[in-house]
Amino acid sequence: MKKFSLVAATLIAGVVLNVNAATVATVNGKSISDTEVSEFFAPMLRGQDFKTLPDNQKKALIQQYIMQDLILQDAKKQNLEKDPLYTKELDRAKDAILVNVYQEKILNTIKIDAAKVKAFYDQNKDKYVKPARVQAKHILVATEKEAKDIINELKGLKGKELDAKFSELAKEKSIDPGSKNQGGELGWFDQSTMVKPFTDAAFALKNGTITTTPVKTNFGYHVILKENSQAKGQIKFDEVKQGIENGLKFEEFKKVINQKGQDLLNSAKVEYK
């Protein structure tokens, strides 16, 4: 629900200090901690722990933060804190934060009965369905002949032997940069994820088998190995309970906040010019 502006996010970033924070850089004698950087980029990281990021990513974020800090230092040197535009933007940010606090106070008063959550699930079970999925690898090549040659190389192989050889050929021959280094691995996907000719061929296979003819798509010619499959199934209530509750809570919040706004409007003296 929180929708802080960039200005507000910049203002509040780094307010909370962690006693275990580690210094990652100094800027003109001022220490920069990993906690400051982590909190500043929290909206972008979306729950990822800054400390667990690869070193090159951490360095890039630290550098961005340092640039932001240097701009801030330069702005202060120019005494822009007294600039009318700064004052205007600061007041606007404060107002936005105050409205968010007001709305969150109302949201926190709303409680959704557990029976109502279960009833919603029972009435909408058709919406809570896991689609059928397959796990597959593929080898993408430019010509039909190349695909046929690969199929011939794989002919007669089964189980681990087939899987190992398929991965080897994918790394050697596939022109799909997104999967070749993983041995052609595509992971799990449903029927809406891939182009139709590919999906139709993958779903038609038995687990542990490959396509016996090349599969043509707009990308080229594919050889597909179906590794595993999952049938369509009902998502359990416990898996979606929190999401349903949050959704119902937000719908109730919209009604409450709209009514509150209407009541305030009705009680105010408004003159349109």
Swiss-Prot record:
Alphabetical list of InterPro entries matching this protein: PPIase_dom_sf, PPIase_PpiC, PPIase_PpiC_CS, PrsA_foldase
The EC number(s) this enzyme carries: 5.2.1.8
Pfam families in the cross-refs: Rotamase_3
Acyltransferase listed as a keyword: no
Keyword Methyltransferase recorded: no
Signal peptide limits: 1-21
Domain PpiC: 131-228
Molecular function, one GO term: peptidyl-prolyl cis-trans isomerase activity
Lineage: Bacteria, Pseudomonadati, Campylobacterota, Epsilonproteobacteria, Campylobacterales
Originating species: Campylobacter jejuni subsp. jejuni serotype O:2 (strain ATCC 700819 / NCTC 11168)
Keyword set, alphabetical order: Isomerase, Rotamase, Signal
Broadest EC class assigned to this enzyme: isomerase
Name of this protein: Putative peptidyl-prolyl cis-trans isomerase Cbf2
Entries under Gene3D superfamilies matching the protein: 1.10.8.1040, 3.10.50.40, 6.10.140.970
